[in-house]
């Protein structure tokens, strides 16, 4: 039997180390930035994807971690955290992921005054949907 992308898609999978703030849809980043008045390095989806992608030569750890500044900038409200958690769960489900361990640092989402408990509750609510 030849292993095809369709077969792989149907196989049950486990995602054991998934960073919430590294799993946003490009369209969602742009929409949340518009809603929240956040300035992005580009409003064009193709350009933003290039900016956020690692590519073949990842560069330094500092370069890699710096990309999270962009996603974190739009994850400072309960609504945005709930939305991206929900979208992550949906995307994983569509990819055949049946077990998902999501990680994030709640304190990185408190820059605009959100409480730590709000960050946790929002992510839990999004994942539970």
Annotated model-derived regions:
Residues 1-129:
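Metal-cofactor-binding active-site regions of metalloenzymes
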């Amino acid at each position: 039997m030849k292993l095809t992308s369709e077969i792989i898609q149907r196989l049950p999978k486990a995602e054991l180390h998934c960073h919430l703030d590294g799993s946003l849809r490009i369209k969602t980043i742009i929409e949340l930035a518009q809603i929240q008045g956040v300035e992005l390095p580009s409003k064009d989806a193709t350009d933003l994807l290039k900016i956020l992608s690692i590519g073949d030569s990842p560069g330094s750890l500092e370069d890699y971690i710096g990309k999270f500044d962009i996603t974190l900038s739009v994850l400072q409200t309960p609504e945005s955290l709930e939305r991206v958690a929900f979208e992550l769960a949906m995307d994983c489900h569509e990819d055949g992921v049946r077990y998902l361990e999501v990680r994030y640092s709640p304190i990185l989402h408190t820059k605009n005054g959100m409480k730590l408990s709000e960050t946790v509750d929002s992510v839990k609510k999004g994942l539970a949907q």
